[in-house]
Amino acid sequence: MKIYRYLLVWAIALAFATAAFSQDVKTDYDHHANFERYHTYYWQSVKTDDPLWQSRVQDAVDHALQAKGWQRVDSNGDVAVGAVGAVHNQREYQTFYDGFGGWRWGGFGREATTTVQNYQIGTVVVDLYDTQSKSLIWRGSASDTLSSKPEKNENKLDKAVDKMFKDFPPNK
């Protein structure tokens, strides 16, 4: 019976943990920038801990910007694009209390089970700079839990960048 309770606690913890971690995508922009005058862009830099992810981030952003009608050029574009990707470790503690609390006689079965879950969070930040004024005109960021499978993480990256650029260029 104790093993059943232990497995149930783990199943509940896993269900809550999975539901709690979803993509967090945010965007912000310079409200004075005239996005109608921007048509070309070039890559200034892409920095990630893993060199394989540099081209993946670049490809995802290229796809999103080109879908909006922007054209990539080698240099001297209207906008310079920079991106940074990072991974950090996260730990979550969840405690479940078994048994029933007592009113008068102290209850019974008071056991607590604490589970620790370690996971990694991946974050990507994309910045767009006006090349004339050298000022930041748009920023998008996304964070999500990472899988142990690179193809799943690449799919998450593509979805995150699509969400970032969903309402791009911003309306005034």
Regions found by a protein language model. Give the residues of each.
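Surface-exposed short loop/turn segments
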Residues: 68, 83-135, 143
